[in-house]
Amino acid sequence: LSFFEIVIYYATVALNHFPTIQRGEKNMLEILELEQEDEKPPSFAQSKDSWLVAVLANIKDERIELPPDVPEDALADFDHIETIRAIQAAIETDGHRTVFIQADSNLPYALKQIKPDICFNIAEGLGGDGREAQVPGLLEMLRIPYTGSRVVTNAISLDKTLTKRIWRDRRLPVAPFQEFLTGDEPLRPEMRFPLFVKPAREGTGMGVDTGAIVNNEAEARERAKWVIRTYRQPALVEQYLPGREFTVAVMGRPDSKLYSRHPEWYDVDGFHRFPIMELDSSCSITPGIYGKAAKSKDIGEEGAPDFYCPARVDDELAKKLQYYAWRGHNLLGALDISRVDIRLDAKGQPCLIEINTLPGLTPDFSDLCVIAKAEGITYKELILEILYLGASRWGMLEARELTPALKKGAGSRVMYRR
């Protein structure tokens, strides 16, 4: 079996520990065949004040033992059932009904049976280099509204190399990088040691530990070949950035204030500027590396990084970080919410690392939730804001009239001129 086939098998076993709907016995052709009555897109009454919201996710079960040829972090992107319950509880406080549906191979049939008004999507997908686009693609085929970024953006954002190429070509700062398919490719002359090697199409710090930093060509090739062999995908090799690390959340779009429950949160461009979070991993279980081991630690736990939110930065650096995150979000066509990771180079200049269009939503643990809490935004408010931003894109909400004060927005637009 291939790596992805093994992951899919064990993920499905894990998911079966959490049944939420009756499995259907129809084959896939019957599942995907749309009845004539379903040919029309869903119609939503503007006055409708209660929806059936399906929360879509992949659930991890740490009781499942993976085979020895599969990396121990293979299911790191998946969510715990407690996170799903927290999202459901937040949505239900506003009068909606919720149901959790596992994002496995039975998802098409489940959606046809349950007929949700909208899906709150945090599903990572099962296998493949575009797995985060699998569920959005299915939802668009079935014409079911959903939250978050759409198909193309979710496919691109998981591919770190492609994301960096887009950012670089649009003059956003990224460290020099190169993708290795075999590990034997000639090293480009602009690649100066130390370098940093990681899987090109993974998230949650998978494949990232202290061994990711390499100091010579032999180490670089050995690490790249290990990544390619272990994760069955290309290795991304990039200039190591020794400076401070930040994560910047981006929420909204140009017309956010017309539909948001909190229009006062948004600037004149329709985006909310969360406080910047700094991640200090110098004291973590993997010093200087914010990888899987460090990310799995609770805040304050021994071996966890130190977090500072708001970050301890001057106004000039704050403007750069906010602008680059906002620009990176928009260039990829991200919607509703994202989180952009940025690190400083040896000269103290910011370089974009990657974007997460499906940021974690575990209360009091995930970076986005900690950032929101630091600003005084409750978990319930965050979840409902994401839900309503998504719903408004599908015609499920009426636009409001903006007062002069709301038109002005929460501060000036995000701008930085180099």
Predicted regions and their residues:
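Phosphate-binding site of ATP-dependent enzymes
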Residues: 217-323, 344-351
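Active-site nucleotide/adenylate-binding loops and adjacent lid/helix of ATP-dependent enzymes
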Residues: 21-23, 29-35, 40-42, 46-57, ...
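Short acidic/His/Gly/Ser-rich catalytic and metal-binding motifs that mark active-site loops
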Residues: 62-67, 203-206, 299-301, 362-363
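Short phosphate-binding/catalytic loops that engage adenosine nucleotides
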Residues: 96, 144, 172, 232, ...
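ATP-dependent carboxylate activation and anion-phosphoryl transfer catalytic cores
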Residues: 9-14, 20-25, 29-41, 166-168, ...
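ATP-binding N-terminal substructure of ATP-dependent carboxylate-amine bond-forming enzymes
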Residues: 3-146, 152, 157-158, 162, ...
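Alpha-helix N-cap recognition
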Residues: 103, 215-217, 378
